[in-house]
A protein has these predicted regions:
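Helix-adjacent hinge/juxtasegments
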Residues: 81-114, 118
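Short beta->alpha transition motifs characteristic of CBS
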Residues: 59-66
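Short beta-strand scaffold segments in enzyme catalytic cores
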Residues: 47-53
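Generic structural signal for well-ordered alpha-helical scaffold segments
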Residues: 33, 37, 80, 84-85
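Zinc-dependent deaminase
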Residues: 2-39, 103, 112-178
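Short, flexible loop/turn motifs enriched in small residues
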Residues: 42-46
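A short, polar/charged loop-to-alpha-helix boundary motif
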Residues: 68-81
Length: 178
């Protein structure tokens, strides 16, 4: 593990808990923000995700592709598909998914069904909903739920306040241009 750890306060099921995110994890989360920026630059919603093996190597990364017309082309869903096709059940369970935003219910379900391990996210569904409301964006067709309401036994860490404002800015930019 890297030496420096950053404490992030999260709200989960009505109580506050602290999570620790180390330097390596911050680098993966920054890569997620870079991928989200790439999506934005391509005219897509700004989300990015990285799948990392237990040993620390990046296995797969992607950003949103919903502008293609297929609303299921979320990076977290693509990670689940890739992992199901390319990893053993044991390797999936030991892997970590880093992502710019908390999984939506569809992606959380895919994560659970495939048997992926821990999730670390920069911004929560609750934060995103508040940001979009502030921007006057209509509610999506699927209600946002915390990951643990969809996959109760998965290890989840986030949000990471030190990076969340960068994600908020990407959403502000996307929705001000649409």
């Amino acid at each position: 593990m890297d030496g420096t750890r950053i404490s992030a306060s999260i709200l989960a099921t009505g109580f506050e808990e602290h999570v620790m995110v180390n330097d390596g994890e911050i680098q993966h989360l920054r890569r997620c923000i870079e991928l989200a920026t790439e999506a934005l630059e391509l005219g897509d919603e700004p989300f990015g995700s990285v799948l990392v093996a237990a040993e620390g190597q990046v296995l797969f990364e992607d950003h949103n592709h919903v502008a293609s017309g297929d609303r299921t082309r979320h990076p977290e869903f693509e990670i689940a598909r890739w992992a199901a096709a390319n990893m053993t059940p044991e390797a999936r369970a030991e892997a970590t998914v880093y992502t710019s935003g908390e999984h939506c219910p569809m992606c959380a379900a895919a994560h659970g069904w495939v048997g992926l391990g821990r999730i670390v996210y920069v911004s929560s569904s609750e934060q995103l909903a508040a940001w979009l409301t502030d921007l006057g964006v209509p509610a999506p067709p699927v209600r946002a739920l915390p990951i643990r309401e969809v996959v109760p036994n998965v290890a989840v860490e986030g949000p990471v306040p030190a990076l969340a404002e960068q994600v908020r800015d990407l959403h502000r930019r996307f929705h001000s241009s649409t």
